[in-house]
């Protein structure tokens, strides 16, 4: 009896040990699989966003050879941004032609309504003034006393002047809403050189990292510069909040790390405003909107320099820079653009059309001697010429989608 019990106990113990070994083996395999998956994902991500050493070398050799062959005006270097594929460090997605036409139709309708309303108010005001003039003239005519007539005329003249001043003040306020730079401070477009990139007229160059958020950085950079120009106050806006929260007027996301469009940013800032970097620091990846509360940093008005969002003429671009400050725009980035160090970027790469662009940038000035725009990029101050690049007029579709904004006070 005792021997039979021992036999059963041994059998049970054996089964239990086998079960433990099986579970342990499964756990080890699971752990091993997880690590392998992580390593595999890392390699895939690295392959997706980066160039291999051989690819970098080959790309640089090709760029240098092309520069020498075509005798270009700019120099290049092996910088940090050359390590990444272009698609991972750009990311602008222009609206379709249908979308632009729809937006333009909406804008025209609103402008026509506003025009008719303003004209109606103007006619009513003229009618009121004419009736007032006739009434006072009748009163004056009834007065027999010459001194009284003179006094009444003097009072009438003073009232007229006050009314004129009031109308002029109203016009000045309306004009301020239609421009960001006061007319007496705006640079002349006849200047051969001008740029909003001084210590008192521009904010620091930011770095978007390996995230296609150039559209968000451009939206923030344009607002920061123009707010500084208008109010004399330096801002550091949150690109992360723009990345996570911005939607256009139709409720569509302005973009993500896979690309976007700054038009949606300005739509959002018209309604909600913008948060500061301190409130929502940049993480370099798309997240969840942490706050939708309205802020004081709003856009009063914005629009494209050309109604069809096409590439403006140099004169049109200068006028916008003079009137509004920094301008949001786009360009086609190539390996040569990535490797830019100094000089005037005059690649004139092959393009399929005016909207063949992939990167949002900020245009802050011009130089007619260089025949180029001064562009503020979002790849950090160590890239290019301290974060800036001179791009020759017309090169690589520079200026497509150029847009201006008027910021709050």
Locate each region found by the language model:
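Sec/Tat signal peptide C-region and signal peptidase I cleavage site
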Residues: 26-30
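Bacterial N-terminal signal peptides
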Residues: 13-24
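Catalytic-core signature of thiol
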Residues: 31-409
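Bacterial N-terminal signal peptides that target proteins for export
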Residues: 3-15
């Amino acid at each position: 009896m005792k021997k039979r019990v021992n036999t059963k106990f041994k059998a049970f113990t054996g089964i239990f040990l086998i079960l433990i070994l099986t579970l342990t083996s499964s756990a080890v395999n699971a752990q091993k699989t997880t690590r392998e998956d992580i390593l595999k994902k890392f390699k895939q991500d690295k392959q997706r966003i980066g160039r291999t050493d051989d690819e970098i070398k080959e790309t640089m050799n090709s760029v240098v050879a092309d520069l020498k062959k075509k005798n270009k005006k700019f120099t290049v270097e092996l910088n940090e941004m050359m390590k990444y594929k272009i698609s991972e460090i750009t990311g602008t997605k222009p609206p379709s032609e249908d979308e632009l036409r729809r937006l333009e139709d909406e804008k025209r309708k609103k402008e026509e309504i506003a025009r008719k309303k303003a004209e109606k108010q103007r006619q009513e005001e003229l009618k009121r003034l004419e009736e007032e003039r006739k009434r006072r003239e009748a009163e004056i005519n009834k007065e027999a006393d010459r001194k009284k007539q003179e006094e009444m005329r003097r009072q009438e003249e003073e009232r007229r002047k006050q009314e004129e001043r009031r109308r002029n003040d109203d016009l000045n306020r309306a004009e301020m809403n239609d421009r960001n730079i006061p007319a007496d401070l705006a640079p002349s477009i006849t200047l051969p050189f001008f740029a909003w990139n001084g210590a008192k007229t521009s904010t620091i160059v930011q770095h978007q990292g390996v995230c296609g958020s150039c559209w968000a950085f451009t939206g923030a950079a344009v607002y920061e510069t123009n707010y500084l120009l208008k109010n004399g106050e330096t801002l550091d806006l949150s690109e992360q909040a723009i990345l996570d929260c911005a939607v256009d007027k139709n409720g569509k996301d302005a973009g993500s790390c896979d690309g976007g469009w700054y038009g949606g940013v300005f739509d959002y800032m018209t309604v909600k405003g913008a948060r500061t970097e301190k409130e929502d620091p940049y993480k370099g990846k798309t997240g969840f909107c942490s706050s939708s509360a309205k802020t004081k940093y709003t856009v009063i008005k914005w629009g494209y320099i050309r109604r069809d969002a096409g590439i403006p003429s140099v004169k049109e671009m200068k006028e916008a820079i003079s009137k509004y400050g920094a301008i949001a725009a786009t360009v086609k980035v190539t390996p040569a653009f990535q490797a830019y160090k100094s000089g005037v970027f005059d690649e004139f790469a092959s393009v399929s059309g005016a909207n063949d662009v992939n990167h949002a940038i900020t245009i802050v000035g011009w130089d007619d001697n260089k025949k180029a725009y001064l562009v503020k990029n979002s790849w950090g101050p160590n890239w290019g010429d301290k974060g800036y690049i001179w791009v020759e007029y017309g090169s690589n579709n520079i200026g497509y989608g150029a847009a201006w904004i008027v910021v709050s006070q």
